[in-house]
A protein has these predicted regions:
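Nucleotide-activated donor-dependent transferases that construct or modify glycoconjugates
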Residues: 3-18
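Extended catalytic core of nucleotide-activated donor transferases of GT-like folds
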Residues: 13-15, 22-27, 32-33, 38-135
Length: 135
């Protein structure tokens, strides 16, 4: 969190993955730093996705996920100072282009829990100003 506290700007759009209570803990810490935080998760409706994946209907699963992320982006706050994304594995170019257009002056930060070699969407890294990792 120390790196985020050093960044200028108080409005943060935090895009998490809804993993246990990590996202809520991160939001609480950001608020302690006097940041105004808006949030959404890229992993809502996970049960529907799991069912389709188990049935080997990956195209349907991907379409549902993409629509869900589109809907979340359209509902998200705009003109943020920082867009802070954890993992970002479900984003495609269109999602990040839309986020950039809604937050034209924001610093885009990607935080990775995994090594870059494990990313399936390496092409989206170019949309981020900073990439941080646990390493």
């Amino acid at each position: 969190m120390n790196k985020l506290s050093q960044l200028k700007g108080h409005r943060i759009l935090f895009i998490g993955i809804g993993f246990y209570d990590y996202d809520q803990s991160i939001i609480a810490e950001l608020k302690k730093l006097n940041k105004e935080v808006s949030y959404f998760s890229t992993h809502t409706n996970i049960w529907n996705l799991l069912i389709f994946k188990r049935l080997h209907l990956n195209k349907i699963s991907e379409k549902i996920l993409k629509k869900n992320i589109d809907r979340q982006i359209n509902r998200s706050s705009i003109n943020n100072d920082i867009v802070f994304v954890i993992k970002g594995e479900n984003f495609d170019d269109s999602h990040l282009i839309k986020l950039r257009s809604l937050n034209p002056n924001a610093i885009f930060i990607l935080y990775l829990w995994d090594d870059l070699h494990r990313l399936k969407n390496l092409n989206t890294l170019n949309y981020f100003d900073k990439i941080w990792s646990f390493d």
